[in-house]
Amino acid sequence: MREKTPKQIVDLLDKYIVGQNEAKKSVAIALYNRYRRTQLPEDVQKDITPKNILMAGPTGVGKTEIARRLADIVDAPFVKVEATKFTEVGYVGRDVESMVRDLANEAVRIVEKEEFVKVESQAIRQANKTLVRLLVPGVKRNNRQNQMQQMQEMMQSLLAGGGMPEETEEVTDEIRNQRLSVAEKLDRGLLENEEVTIEVEQAPKANPMGDMMGQMGMDMSSMLGDMLPKKKVKRTLPVGQARKLLVQEEEKKLVNYDDIYQKAMDRAGQSGIIFIDEIDKITAADKRNSAGVSREGVQRDILPIVEGSTVSTKYGPLSTDHILFIAAGAFAESKPSDLIPELQGRFPIRVELNALTKDDFVRILKDPQNSLLKQYIALLKADGVDLVFTAEAVDKIAEIAFEVNQGTDNIGARRLATILEKLLEEVLYEGPDMEMGQITITQAYVEQKLSDIVKNKDLTKFIL
């Protein structure tokens, strides 16, 4: 399947993000260049590195939203991290290499999902066979082997990677006929609500040492593999739910995880994308730096990752040479030139996002696929209430949002969510008790609910 063209990517972003065409174009071109590179000879491919992007603009204008929507659009491993979460090597906290390990985990998840689809029909057949055996159990054999022989068989099975040996059972002609009947009913979907008891692997508990081991590229559970028996728990579920769990277990048995890890590492290295948000908060000029922790040190730690280096992950080494990095920040109290020169040079494409106007707010309220107004209309529809906004009301909401942003801190489109929540507070509260019908939000209603608050600057600061 051919990759999406830059125009197609921009069209998809337009469904959710108003304006900021320059940023959309830059991101779309950078993404499509990944595809162009794959069409070249290998000796040329290795010399073409991604052109990393630095997006600067006020808060609430769409930087993070572009990243969020990109994750849905691109068929590539994508992770979003915040620069403020990282600490310099030597301090307690996440090291910068963890973003690459997160990308490796995401790549494995994507490839694993693709491989599961390939074996799904086989896994379903196997799960149905298991369900038939559980619904019509056989007669347990009275095994008279001595304990030493049982222990030997168990150890041989564990060393061979087969887990604990299953108990043998005897199937009589009567049981065989019953199983054929149950199998037919299963195929016709007649037993979906019947309860069945199954054994499933217990989800691993969070290990406080796990993250530390992960940072060193080690994973003890992977290293031990199948040497230790998997802990299983019994669960009684309807057949439909039980089948889903059994299919998942069968899929894991049918796929080759060595191949999955190899494909995932290749995909993460060749087409992975890392979005670094809040990069302006780690500049030396930012006033919010905590004393003692050098933000410049974090920049210097990020530098080799962006330049291209090899990071150890639990799936193997991952090279960052061809990973695309997109950094974003408001740069309200600093500017891109406050980043260390070496890091600036690694983000050759600079994009400035514009502050939002009143007209932008009107479009944000109405145009996107799941705009704020459409969300509230859908929420009240659940109570049987039809919520309608007049054009004048929408215009007034946008005007108030713009005025409040100008008069207090400018938080961009996020101001709309605060204003709408305050505006519709009473409607949302009374909604379940209202008779089914239509509620129309007019300009007069908006002014009645919000004008007094907007005029009082002290109230505005605390409420809107």
Curated annotation (Swiss-Prot):
GO terms for cellular component: HslUV protease complex. The keyword ATP-binding applies. Keywords: ATP-binding, Chaperone, Cytoplasm, Nucleotide-binding. InterPro entries: AAA+_ATPase (IPR003593), ATP-dep_Clp_protease_ClpX (IPR050052), ATPase_AAA_core (IPR003959), Clp_ATPase_C (IPR019489), HslU (IPR004491), P-loop_NTPase (IPR027417). Transmembrane segments: none annotated. GO terms for molecular function: ATP binding; ATP hydrolysis activity; peptidase activity; proteasome-activating activity. It is found in: Cytoplasm. Gene3D superfamilies: 1.10.8.60, P-loop containing nucleotide triphosphate hydrolases. Pfam families: AAA, AAA_2, ClpB_D2-small. GO terms for biological process: protein unfolding; proteolysis involved in protein catabolic process. ATP binds at V18, G60, V61, G62, K63, T64, E65, D277, E342, R414. Its main location: cytoplasm. Belongs to the ClpX chaperone family. HslU subfamily. ATPase subunit of a proteasome-like degradation complex; this subunit has chaperone activity. The binding of ATP and its subsequent hydrolysis by HslU are essential for unfolding of protein substrates subsequently hydrolyzed by HslV. HslU recognizes the N-terminal part of its protein substrates and unfolds these before they are guided to HslV for hydrolysis. A double ring-shaped homohexamer of HslV is capped on each side by a ring-shaped HslU homohexamer. The assembly of the HslU/HslV complex is dependent on binding of ATP. This is ATP-dependent protease ATPase subunit HslU. The gene is hslU.
